[in-house]
Amino acid sequence: MATPNKGGSLKDCLATWNQLAEGKSSCDYTYHMSMIEWKPTIAAEIQEMIAAGITSFKMYMAYDNLRTTDAEIFEAMKEIKKVNGMLGVHCENGDLVDELIQSYVSQGKLTPHYHPLSRPAAVEAEAVARYLMIAEMADLSVNIVHLSTKRSLEAVERARQRGQSVYVETCPQYLLLDDHLYDAPNFEAAKYVCSPPLRKREDQQALWQGIKEGAINTISTDHCSFNFHGQKTVGKDDFSKIPNGMPGVETRPELIYTEGVAKGRITLEKMVALLSENIAKQFSMYPQKGVVQEGSDADLVVWDPRTTGVIAARTQLQNVDYTPYEGFETQGQARMVYLRGQKVAEAGQVILANQGKFVFRKAT
């Protein structure tokens, strides 16, 4: 996710992120371009981003420093439609979230227990429904990022019944973790503070069913890592000051294989579609990525379905001091990873680093 500074240009943001990534990434990469404000200069840059190989954009309906108005989202949709781009939106009703947080804080209710209560399922479902109504007006096919609730999925189904094209993404944390973790002692609950927050088990069940039925197209991570010590602990006296986000990019394949394939919820082919093929198709990388065929990039994973393991922060490669899946027993592991035909990882270790290249995408 490339996010410009307030007042900055998308072009400068892209240049900054390319500079950060070039020669330093061990996998191929591209970005969603965030638009945290909307003005004529930003609108004019949409076409420039397409020309630079960026076809997907992100906006926010929550977070005061990031969100835009409904009217601005509508205007952005119209510009994105002109270039056949893709828009994804963080769907939460920002006004209601702010009001709920202020209410709990003013009552002295400051522990992480109140984080999910300040962002209930209704504020996501309402925003999803509103976003999809706006998309219907703009006649734009859209993406919903990190969908977490049964009620949101119901809003998607209503939109699809109206004839809308809607893509839905969820994440492992919404499939495997639930809101009882916000009552963990010794401030451990702060490790699970993310937005949308972890939900109830009935939401997990609905999401797995949505995956099985094809209502959910992709599984990403919403990876946004903050160290527990020194960053999450900033909010030890006020949950509203805890940085929102969790690490997850490293553990996604093992978790989805363990909880999805090994437990019979989905097939291996379905897992590949959710984690690779559908993403490549949705974001204009297919058939360069997302398929094994002549002329494609030969990005391959040799998967060992029998290897077992235990997730632990002390053995992870992610640059963060904890994992929300500490102690999870896993089945299945990537034995070897090939990038454009070159072996770059084996037995959980990178053996050929910094070979990643920018993936130039063409809007289709």
Regions found by a protein language model. Give the residues of each.
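Short, acidic/turn-prone active-site loops that include or flank metal/cofactor-
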Residues: 3-4, 171-173, 245
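Histidine/acidic residue-rich metal-binding segments in metalloenzymes
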Residues: 41-219, 235
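Metal-associated gating/positioning segment near the N- to mid-region
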Residues: 1-24, 41
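Short, ordered loop/turn segments at secondary-structure junctions
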Residues: 2-6, 34, 62, 92-93, ...
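C-terminal cap of metal-dependent C-N hydrolases
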Residues: 233-238, 294-359
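His/Asp/Glu-enriched, well-ordered alpha-helical/loop segment
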Residues: 110-141, 192, 213, 217-219, ...
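Active-site beta->alpha loop and helix N-cap motifs at the rims of alpha/beta catalytic domains
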Residues: 35-40
